[in-house]
Amino acid sequence: MTAGNPAADPQGAPAEILEHRLALVMNGGVSLAVWMGGVACEIDNVRRASNGIPPRDGATEQEKAVHELWARATQRAGVRVTVDVIAGTSAGGLNGVLLATAIARGASLAGLEELWHDSGQMSAEALFRPQQNGVLSLMNGDFFHDQIAGELRQMTPTPHGRDVSLIVTSTALGSSSREVRDSAGDSFWEADHRRRFHFSRHGARPCYREGDDGYQLHDGEPVDDLTDDETLAWAGRASASYPVAFAPVEETPLLRQRRVWPDWKTSDTPDWLADGGILDNSPFDPVLESIQRKPVTGPWKRTLCFVVPSGDEAALGRDITPPAGGGAGNQPPEPPPWTSVAAAAFGFPREANFRDDIDHLHRTIHHGRSSFDVSRFLLLTDNIPAASTEAAPAAEDPLTEARRICTAVLPLYRQSCTAAAIYQVRDTIVRSRPNGYIDPVSEITDPGFGNAAHPWRPGTFPAAGDPLPTAWKWGADAADRVVRTMLRATTSESARGLRSASSEAGLGDLRKDLSKRLHQIAAISQAIDEYLVSAGTDAASLDDPIVIGMLDNAYDALGAGTALASSVAGAAQAYAGGRLAAPARAPDVLAAALAVEVSNGAGSLPDDSPRPVFDFARFGLGNPPPLLQDAYNSAMTGPDGTPNDPNNILYGTRLNHFAAFADADWRDWDWMWGRMNALARLARLLGLNDDEVNDLTKAILAAEGRGLPAVQDGITTAMNYTGKEIRDHLRSADRFPPALDALFDLLRSDAPTNPPLRTEIHDLGQAVSDLLARSGHEGHVKHHVLRDAALIIRHPFWKHVEPDR
């Protein structure tokens, strides 16, 4: 833990609060939802407390104490927490829907713990409630939907609502493919069953549309997609439709309107939607894209939080002993048993999913150059005089030298940006089509592209004394990168602790102005893309001259150069006046930002999808608060000296992730542990000291009705609980009968299947039900003689299942 926050002054009172923005990617299935709910609860607690929002509705005195401790700790650290992007998959989709709705409406998660405690139970009154439309799955998904919708209806809007973006994933069943072609023109089919639904609450953003005086920027309308309880409930229910456990759901017309993936045109036929975790476990890309569009006003820092309730990837293959280097007589050693091989074969795909997620994040961070761009920009602008009356910079100051170098390499930059434009236009057009290319860009045929003028390609680098442009010749993507560099330069030093937040006091209006101009540029870019898609719909060819002509026409028809120049020049003026106190030096500010742009693009293609600057934090099952760390470390070794599976700390990881639904005490434990994991991770992110963390640990445990010694003992109990002990406990608590009743109901169900089951298989399911279903729950019996004769088998079977029978 750190002792404080570098933004604070010597007396411990920060001059300006650092906004710590969290983007959450929530991933987990079935009863792991309970742990994730605990994490969401604690994140919401610190969000509310640090922003001066009162404790959640109906908070107990113990919960109010937690709220007060969070408020004091974050105030001392000089930080407030914002959650502005949430992506949820499976059970993460459910919790993400509830958390995002609470944030957007200014409501609270007051009922979330009760929802999981009461509704997440495998009983005939809850998840195994009889299904009205026939037995379509083991559990009653309609019951689950009704509980979620009911919780959403309780979230009454208040003045504390905040802007937030929500992405929920699902998997489409049935046909979902398009015809694509390879580089030789041969066609084949590309399937994509991933579905993403986007909900957002944000203020009015600019739009670029045609009016009486041609295309102009206009103020858009505020957006709030998080008011429709039913559509939100269906999105959460669809994302968590674990195969066979819950029936898939139909994509409603309103839900279809929120679909943003696939990004190519699909049929208008609605889909059947199943669990998002089947194909799209961790949707990082839409989260990063959403981050790009978030406006800022104060100093900020961004953390991408991966909330995933599992560490089982590390345990995979642990039961296989490595070979000892050859057996006796140079014979190969005994291979692993087939059971271990089978377990590895089924388990290793989990490793692949998790590894791909981490590799993707690593590449994103590695390829990001935003911090370096800002450093170069600051180096060039630090020597700009602070008063407009001062003389121009000396001949070889950094900015003058940069102008000279950029002028020399501009031909290389022009080639790069032309190639990038051709690639991007082709990709934009092809991705919008229901058919396309697996390699839509092919090779650029002319490495030079001649010297013809184009409205999106610069002819010269701005010289000293040049005014701000009235027509922007650098393209929309470069405009975004240039203004984004200016915006990032207003906060990155305080966020990294290199400068106190007090040095950034008064920059709020500047950040707001630059954020607005980025939205203007995004609106113009969207209009350009829409023009290109329309123009390219019937294009027989997408060779270089045709693509360049399309782009020229788009800029001319839309007046994009003039509109972009207004936004970029306005950004440079705002930065020069607001940050440098030298409004007349706006052309030099723009030249400095363009120098960064040219130096990046002269040797490679400019990046058309800039990545935000962010830290990465994984919210997982390990790393509890310090007061619980020793007990956790000790429990990692079992009584016989063998290592325990770290996943055992949660009951929700047992019985194929269903166990927490079987026992209310287990759900309460998982919820509490989620709060503990969130506290430990948030404490490190926000710079809390040890005393603050210890006080919060004890306060949260008190709010959960638990004492510290009991929790320390509970860690040992959970980690050493064997599968047999879990099954014995569930049997003694009569948890198996409703599950078996549901299984037999499904086996004898007459619900249609696709493809239709063979008659022999259906009859076998009916026979198993007739043979073993308990009295009173046997449904329609077809094999009466078999059932009567099987009493001698059925009675001891149920005696074992129900010890008190």
Predicted segments with their positions:
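Acidic, Ser/Thr-rich low-complexity intrinsically disordered segments
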Residues: R318-T321, P335, P349, R355, ...
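Long, C-terminal catalytic modules of enzymes
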Residues: F377-A395, R654-L686
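Patatin-like phospholipase
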Residues: L18, A23, L32-T156, A172, ...
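Flexible, membrane-associating and regulatory peripheral segments of lipid-active enzymes
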Residues: M1-L24, N45, D84, A591
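Extended hydrophobic secondary-structure segments that form protein cores and membrane-embedded regions
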Residues: L22-M26, V83-S90, D118-M122, V164-T171, ...
